[in-house]
């Protein structure tokens, strides 16, 4: 997935600003880092929020990144949708889901804000996987 994912993301970022990909990749790697594990989540990518430089340019950038993301997801699903999971792959998936839970509950700003400000816990925690494992 890494090649399929990083090249189009870099290309769509570079169309708007040659510094965006490097800047937002570093932000992604930092934001999605699990310090208690010494590891990052996922396979990389870009991350940004509160982008308020120039509304029209920012909108076009976000739109292009969204179109690229939709394309990438479609391609990955198309290539993988009929593959069978091995027992080992399922174990890895459950461990990755565990890392997702850890990140969301310990570090994600949106989750922390929602839970600390009296938000509806059911709605906030709805993204939690139904099954996860830890080692």
Protein language model regions, located:
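Residue-level recognition of well-ordered secondary-structure positions
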Residues: 7-8, 70, 104
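Extended, compositionally biased non-globular segments
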Residues: 55-101
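Intrinsically disordered, low-complexity terminal/linker regions enriched in Pro/Ser/Gly
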Residues: 11-28, 35-37, 134-135
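C-terminal structured interaction module
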Residues: 99-135
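Aromatic/basic-lined ligand-recognition segments
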Residues: 28-52, 98-100, 105
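Active-site acidic/histidine clusters and adjacent loop/turn architecture
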Residues: 16-27, 41-55, 60, 64
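Short, small-residue-biased leader/transition segments that mark boundaries at the very start
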Residues: 1-12
């Amino acid at each position: 997935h890494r090649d399929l994912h990083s090249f189009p993301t870099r290309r769509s970022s570079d169309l708007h600003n040659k510094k965006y990909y490097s800047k937002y990749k570093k932000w992604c790697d930092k934001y999605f880092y699990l310090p208690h594990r010494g590891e990052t989540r996922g396979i990389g990518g870009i991350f940004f929020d509160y982008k308020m430089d120039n509304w029209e340019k920012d909108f076009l950038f976000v739109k292009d990144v969204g179109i690229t993301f939709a394309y990438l997801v479609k391609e990955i699903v198309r290539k993988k949708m009929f593959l069978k999971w091995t027992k080992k792959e399922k174990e890895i998936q459950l461990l990755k889901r565990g890392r997702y839970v850890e990140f969301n509950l310990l570090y994600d700003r949106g989750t922390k804000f929602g839970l600390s400000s009296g938000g509806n816990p059911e709605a906030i925690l709805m993204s939690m996987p139904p099954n996860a494992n830890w080692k």
